[in-house]
């Protein structure tokens, strides 16, 4: 089942004071400004991509300062068309609907790909939003076919969807034969939605199994932080390793990983109504809200435990690298969106905490400290995100998924508080 926002929760939320502004109206104006900025940045970017880089999608900035774009097979390919759909949804601007459809169609063949667990990111952010906003059957069919492709990666023995093909772990010692990453919680939405659209409960059952195993094995229940990678024995389903690939240490908390978990278990509650998911999502959120390591502006460092005693890094860092501590705007954007939805299902006191934190994140992201000036940042919206610090990949740069979840969070705020 797909849960609607409870009326009592919405009424309670509407009464909350907007924490980052003098008034509800001021936050709404900030949201309007963000989407105006998005239109000014993305229209020339879309035009340039169509004219000069057909078939590719913008994602980030390369070390040499040029735009980094990707082919449709990249795991991040769905975020730019998804952002265009969100701009169209917020503004009603038909030009952005045309842009969104154009870039969404680039991904059509990806519905048949079975070599990636990221089909949820790729196809639901693009085709899922396309179907939601247009109702076109062709988009619906692509969503269901994509879910069928994703389901081929599910192992009944493990009870999870395999994230990556077998590889040597980040420490250069472990052999990972069935690695599952916390990010994979985000791809469950594609499976849940496919059951809703097709009536085939197989997808739903796979998603629930994956979520339940993740809840048991990815979460440290003593403090509700998360592991990035859990490697399973592909035959017995036993846990063999709990590690990291993108975090500071195996026992540290990678900031975006925690964000994926909050968002992922919230969407599981939306589709199932299982209170275990609601409870775990709130505990995961509490880890962030009450964390003394969360900076004053609520935009987390790339990992919550960088350089701390008791956390042995997965690679050797210089003192300068440890001291660098770049922020990850993408983690904040994902958390803000997830927390706003979670607030609609939570009791009034917890909802107030969630909304206040999400609003603080969105206010920071909307400030000049994180939002690029029009014409700068290769026309991406947000600055200062991190993909994978341990391997030096995309550090302190814009990222397409930071923009996507930022726009989604602003849309959710407006829907909850009645501005849209």
Residue ranges, per PLM feature:
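Glycan-recognition and catalytic cores of secretory/periplasmic carbohydrate-active enzymes
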Residues: 24-420
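Bacterial Sec-dependent N-terminal signal peptides
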Residues: 1-29
